[in-house]
Amino acid sequence: MIYLDTGCLVKLYYPEEDSEVIAIKTVGLQIVFTPLHNLELTSAMRLKVFRKEATEDQVLDVLQFIRDDLAAGKLIAIDNVNSATIQVAIGLSNQHSATTGSRSLDTLHCALAQTLGITAFLTTDARQLALAKLIGLPVQKW
């Protein structure tokens, strides 16, 4: 299983710069999908409507594609957002945020990925990438 940060997931389901790269990198692979992904992806798509970058119909299509990929097993729903994972994220923040600039959601994504034993970690966020490398996540290069 691979872990995509939400920025990569948005690119996978909605055309943006680097969408094709993400699509190629994920062909045939199972992708972790947590409640954090669900929240952030939904919010990101709604923000696109607010910014006039997407229509309501496009958002509904993306959300349906997500449901379809969950049903088909391309996305694997894993609910590991719990107090133990939050404690891991707090530990990562205490150890690394002062040097990487990583924010709470960066540390939470990395903590979620770390607890799953993923085979690859993809992110478009420089702070999250720095943290992922420091903690030994299998970062996949572009």
Could you describe each region identified by the protein language model?
Residues 1, 34, 114-142:
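Acidic, PIN/NYN-like endoribonuclease modules and their adjacent C-terminal/linker elements
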Residues 1-44, 48-61, 135, 140:
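Short, well-structured N-terminal submotif of metal-dependent ribonuclease cores
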Residues 14, 65-68, 126:
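Short, C-terminally biased terminal segments at protein or domain edges
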Residues 18, 30-31, 71, 75, ...:
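Generic structural signal for secondary-structure transition and capping sites
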Residues 24-27, 72, 114-116:
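Short glycine-enriched loop/turn motifs at secondary-structure junctions
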Residues 38, 50, 69-73, 117-118, ...:
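Short alpha-helix boundary/capping motifs
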Residues 42-93:
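Active-site-proximal, substrate-binding regions of enzyme catalytic domains
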Residues 76-126, 130:
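Active-site neighborhoods of divalent-metal-dependent phosphate/nucleic-acid chemistry enzymes
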